[in-house]
Regions:
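Active-site/ligand-binding neighborhood in enzyme catalytic cores
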Residues: 117-241
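N-terminal Rossmann-like FAD-binding beta1-loop-alpha1 element of flavoenzymes
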Residues: 2-29, 454
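Conserved flavin/dinucleotide-binding core of flavoenzymes
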Residues: 99-102, 248, 317-319, 333-461
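Conserved Rossmann-like nucleotide-cofactor binding loop
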Residues: 12, 35, 274
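Dinucleotide-binding Rossmann-like beta1-alpha1 core, especially the glycine-rich loop
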Residues: 46-128
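Mid-domain catalytic core of redox enzymes
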Residues: 23, 235-353, 360-367, 371, ...
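Short, well-ordered coil/turn residues at beta-beta hairpins
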Residues: 60, 142-143, 270-271
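Glycine-rich FAD pyrophosphate-binding loop
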Residues: 21-45
Length: 461
């Protein structure tokens, strides 16, 4: 059997390659950069351990735990501390704990009494027609009011998509929220009844899903996959075209001319949308144009990782982190209390904070110099967390096109990729522009793509 070509060496492509190899399907993985792993980057500097990209994996699917087990990493996996369940939202420039129970909700200063009273009307608001596509902002204002948009949804959207609720499609970006209204006619009733159904089926919600990393950070996962697949990986290979002729596929690289005639039984494209749009695809002498995918917008983000002496931070840092609503007029999108999540992230007597800046809220900030960006983040931290003194550790990383935006109308892009899979034999798509933007989503996407490829090859999974 001819191997499968996998284009893209992020976590999706790596997962797909590993799962296919487990099924006895040989693969060749092509990655344009000189390393695999994409945005997952962990840096060890002395006793500081910094994550430039994601900080945690949310274990929303058993497939994620299966991958960890199959790689033999269970002994190195560490779950977040109990206090990480606590989250803060900034209001009036101060972090306020997000309520975790009905009583806390009634007492919280995060929302006004008027907003709380408005919430009581939510079960009586009619559901929108199923064929209607609505922005997240419109959906939230209609069902629970403007204040919840400003002080709950807006900051969480910044934390997940670095995007704008006014642009995001509730159906595409938050399908579970959309499904609650469509199935139960109410978000509140849906949460109650949905929780009962999950308990009965043994399922877990994203809110209650455990969060984990590894003793040496998330790049542990990448290193393990890279080691298992090292004979299959070709880094520094930018694929500029793929061709199917007489049922077999060939790939064309801008640099590698060693094996131009190597044939594959299928191709998995695990690339960001802007790279897919540039790819030249030919199927049995027919040009397949992917340029429409260039219209998918990506949010630019810079991550800023700072260490401070514990005595120089007044806040207890007893939680996952703090998110900054846009109405608060701060520079940064939010801050993760990295050293509170997992042990071994900072030296004794010091703390590590990871902040994010830019997004569609302020894309111009990502163009500033590292020193300028650090200064803006530190300015925010002095206000929000009462940080004093100067940082003992400082790192900045830029992602000009970090996160795809599942905006209103995004369904046409997903349908386009699905249609090509169905109509072009041996061509497959996976990754964050198709199956969700979280790290867990990307792992599941790679696993499921491997399953589709195996089914296409008539291999039992």
């Amino acid at each position: 059997m001819k191997p499968i070509a996998i284009i893209g060496g992020g976590i999706t492509g790596l997962t797909a390659a590993f799962e296919l190899e487990q099924l006895g399907v040989s693969t060749t993985l092509f990655e344009a950069a000189d390393r695999v792993g994409g945005v997952i980057q962990t840096v060890r500097d002395g006793e500081f351990l910094a994550e430039y990209g994601p900080n945690t994996i949310l274990e929303t699917s058993p497939l994620i735990g299966d991958l960890v087990r199959d790689l033999g990493l269970e002994d190195r996996r560490i779950y977040s501390s109990e206090q990480a369940e606590k989250r803060y939202i900034v209001r009036n420039k101060r972090p306020v704990k997000l309520p975790g129970s009905p009583l806390e909700f009634l007492l919280t200063p995060l929302f006004s009494y008027r907003a709380k009273a408005r919430l009581l009307l939510e079960p009586f608001i009619r559901r929108a027609p199923s064929e209607m596509e609505e922005s997240l902002a419109s959906f939230v204002k209609r069902r629970i009011g403007r204040e919840f948009l400003d002080y709950a949804i807006n900051p969480f959207v910044a934390g997940i998509y670095s995007g704008a609720p006014e642009n995001l499609s509730v159906r595409e970006a938050f399908p579970r929220l959309y499904a609650l209204e469509q199935r139960y006619g109410s978000l509140i009733l849906g949460q109650i009844l949905g929780a009962r159904e999950r308990r009965r089926k043994g399922g877990v919600s994203r809110k209650n899903a455990p969060k984990f990393s590894f003793d040496e950070g998330l790049e542990t996962l990448i290193q393990s996959l890279g080691e298992k697949l090292k004979k299959n990986i070709r880094t520094g290979q930018t694929i500029i075209g793929i061709t199917r002729q007489n049922g077999s596929w060939k790939v064309k690289s801008d640099t590698d001319t060693r094996r131009p005639d190597e044939e594959y039984s299928g191709v998995l494209l695990a690339l960001p949308a802007f790279r897919l749009a540039e790819l030249q695809v030919t199927c049995e002498s027919r040009k397949v144009n992917l340029s429409m995918l260039s219209r998918i917008e990506y949010a630019p983000v810079a991550s800023v990782v700072l260490g401070f002496h514990r005595k120089d931070v007044e806040h207890h840092l007893d939680g996952f982190g703090a998110l900054n609503p846009e109405v608060e007029k701060l520079h940064s999108l939010g801050t993760i209390f990295s050293s509170s999540l997992f042990p071994g992230r900072a030296p004794d007597g010091q703390v590590l904070l990871t902040s994010y800046i830019g997004g569609l809220r302020a894309p111009h900030l990502v163009t500033k110099t590292p020193d300028e960006i650090c200064a803006l983040v530190i300015e925010d931290l002095r206000v929000i967390l009462d940080v004093r003194g100067e940082p003992t550790f400082k790192r900045t990383c830029f992602y000009p096109r970090a996160i795809p935006q599942y905006d209103v109308g995004y369904g046409r892009f997903k349908q386009f990729m699905t249609s090509l899979e169905q109509n072009e034999s041996g061509l497959f798509f996976a990754g964050h522009c198709r199956d969700g933007v979280s790290l867990g989503d990307s792992i599941v996407s790679g696993h499921e793509a491997a399953g589709r490829i195996a089914a296409n090859l008539n291999i039992s999974t």
